[in-house]
Amino acid sequence: MLLLASASPARRRLLEQACIPHRVQVSGVDEDGIHHSEPPQLVCLLAEAKAKAVHGQLTDPSIHAVLGCDSVLAFEGEVFGKPADAEEAKARWRRMRGHWGDLHTGHCLIATSSTTAISSQCQCITTRVLFADLSDAEIDAYVSSGEPLQCAGGFALEGRGGCVVERLNGCYSNVIGLSLPLLRQWLPQDF
């Protein structure tokens, strides 16, 4: 069984849809205390901190691995996590509309024992995202839905945000919160 070290409902849904047996335990890691100038390294550090925090509290022998994940959007040299409020979300969207950004998700898998066929590893997967050229009214309507305030980069591809993304280059599930193809490579077939 996999233990997901994340509070993200989207990550949990991805695992459920992929029929990967799992449980969830929120790490409680202070994400604001972890810094790095390069987004791929930042998300790996955050994912590793979450996985290690949960792994350190583990007592259930049925858990074979702990997975920590974290995502940020890199846009024109800036790193966007979740917007602080609606005004910040609107300002970001006015900058992002019609442009590409890079959604980085760090994944850290920690095996819980040496007897499992799982090896511990960390990796960042990056997906390029082309945002639709939205009008100010469309941005205001999307932000007023509340959805952009809950997600890294200010959009949820699996929700209303699916209509405001023109194109992806890379892994679809990565934009939602974790790369299922990467997880398939990491986990044994009989997991």
From Swiss-Prot:
One of its GO terms (cellular component) is cytoplasm. It is an enzyme of class 3 (hydrolase). CDD domains: Maf (cd00555). The active site is at D70 (proton acceptor). GO terms for molecular function: nucleoside triphosphate diphosphatase activity. Its EC number is 3.6.1.9. GO terms for biological process: nucleotide metabolic process. Pfam families: Maf (PF02545). Belongs to the Maf family. This is Nucleoside triphosphate pyrophosphatase.
